[in-house]
Amino acid sequence: MSDIVIDASCVLSFLLNQDGSENIVSIVGMNKLVAPSCLPFEIGNAISKLIKRKIISVYEGVSVFHEFARIPIRLIEPDIPNSIVIAGEADSYAYDCYYLNIASQMLLPLFTYDDKMKKTAEKRGIKCL
């Protein structure tokens, strides 16, 4: 059993039972999940977007967030200055680079459905699942 850095795209796909959610379960398996401490805020924001677009109801959104809260994910404070450097070099957002920072510093693989983040990670020598 090892640790995996998981991003919001994978967590949300799993929570909403979207295409590929079975893939998430098979990749995660018995591994321990790690993410930057901003993950709950990202999940909350993504849920609110779904509510605003009338894709889910407020009640469903709250239920999804409660489901998220039950997932055992170790939240870690990212090195924000280093993440800003990565963002500048990669022409990316700091939020995405928090995941890259943690994966790089902890020498862990990254699990993301975000193609741009995956390309940036691979360019930086981070293994992606």
What is each residue range found by the language model?
Residues 30-31, 71, 106, 124:
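Structured helix-beta-strand junction loops
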Residues 44-72, 76-80:
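Active-site-proximal, substrate-binding regions of enzyme catalytic domains
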Residues 1-3, 36, 100-129:
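Acidic, PIN/NYN-like endoribonuclease modules and their adjacent C-terminal/linker elements
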Residues 1-38, 50-62:
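Short, well-structured N-terminal submotif of metal-dependent ribonuclease cores
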Residues 70-116:
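Active-site neighborhoods of divalent-metal-dependent phosphate/nucleic-acid chemistry enzymes
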